[in-house]
């Protein structure tokens, strides 16, 4: 069990405290999904619907990772889940609908829940570091969802492809905005905020798109988040002055220094 101090996000910025404070987890995500699409799902008994939604999407993510979403048919999904075609139609009417549901759920439910844990005050550097950590922590918790959106968007309908691109543009713009705030405040030094934001986002996406590599290297979620924040400081620091943490916690350990 976590102590009150350990659960004190955002002062204690580690994966454990984030999970403790985030109002959704791997186990509850399908209850949230059912609530989001209650009007579209024909099965109205929540317990039965949540159980089958987990089966359907776990199988979808697995089939897509092995052979690609484009090659997957609803018949393949039926065989993998053991749910009849008629049963599947109680939850999804088509592959396009399935892909759209995943995109909408990420952008309209999961992302807002995560961003509610962003720092509302503090320096641009503190807010940027917190946002980077949130991206990494969410990528660890909901890796199959993020991987599906970014890896399979090329084989989706145009609407889903455009939506996936928009996710990327929005995230890049937010990182760029925080970098430019830091530069304006004299806290950061950056000659190209657009490229720096894009580079940071690419490292975030690498975390959940190539998880096998980090698992093989035994890199933990906190290891990667600490590395990314440390790299951010190096990229944005004045060459003549070493950037130091002003938040009261150590970015390299996730532990409070006070």
Feature names for model-found ranges:
Residues 1-49, 245-258:
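N-terminal intrinsically disordered/low-complexity leader segments
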Residues 51, 55-62, 66, 80, ...:
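Alpha-helical structural segments
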Residues 63-97:
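Helix-turn-helix
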Residues 111, 159-185, 194-198, 209, ...:
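Amphipathic alpha-helical packing segments from all-alpha helical-bundle domains
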Residues 116-144, 197-200, 225:
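Hydrophobic alpha-helical connector segments
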Residues 138-141, 181, 197-219, 232-245:
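Amphipathic C-terminal alpha-helical segment
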Residues 140-159, 211-212:
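Amphipathic alpha-helical segments used for helix-helix packing
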Residues 147-150, 191, 243-245:
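Short, hydrophobic secondary-structure boundary micro-motifs
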């Amino acid at each position: 069990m976590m102590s009150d101090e350990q659960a004190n996000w955002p002062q204690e910025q580690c994966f454990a405290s984030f999970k403790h404070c985030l109002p959704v987890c791997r186990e509850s995500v399908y209850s949230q999904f059912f609530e989001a699409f209650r009007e579209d799902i024909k099965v109205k008994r929540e317990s039965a619907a949540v159980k089958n939604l987990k089966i359907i999407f776990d199988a979808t993510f697995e089939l897509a990772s092995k052979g690609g979403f484009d090659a997957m048919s609803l018949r393949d999904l039926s065989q993998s889940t053991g749910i009849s075609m008629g049963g599947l139609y109680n939850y999804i009417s088509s592959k396009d609908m399935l892909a759209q549901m995943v995109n909408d759920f990420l952008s309209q439910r999961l992302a807002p829940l995560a961003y509610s844990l962003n720092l509302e005050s503090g320096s641009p550097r503190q807010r940027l570091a917190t946002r980077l950590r949130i991206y990494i922590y969410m990528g660890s918790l909901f890796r199959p969802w993020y991987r599906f959106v970014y890896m399979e968007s090329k084989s989706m309908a145009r609407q889903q492809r455009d939506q996936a691109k928009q996710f990327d543009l929005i995230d890049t713009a937010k990182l760029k905005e925080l970098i430019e705030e830091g530069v304006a405040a004299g806290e950061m030094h950056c000659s190209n905020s657009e490229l720096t934001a894009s580079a940071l986002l690419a490292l975030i996406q690498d975390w959940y798109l190539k998880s096998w590599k980090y698992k093989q290297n035994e890199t933990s979620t906190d290891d990667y988040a600490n590395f990314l924040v440390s790299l951010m400081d190096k990229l944005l620091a004045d060459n003549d002055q070493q950037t130091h943490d002003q938040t009261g916690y150590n970015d390299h350990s996730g532990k409070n220094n006070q």
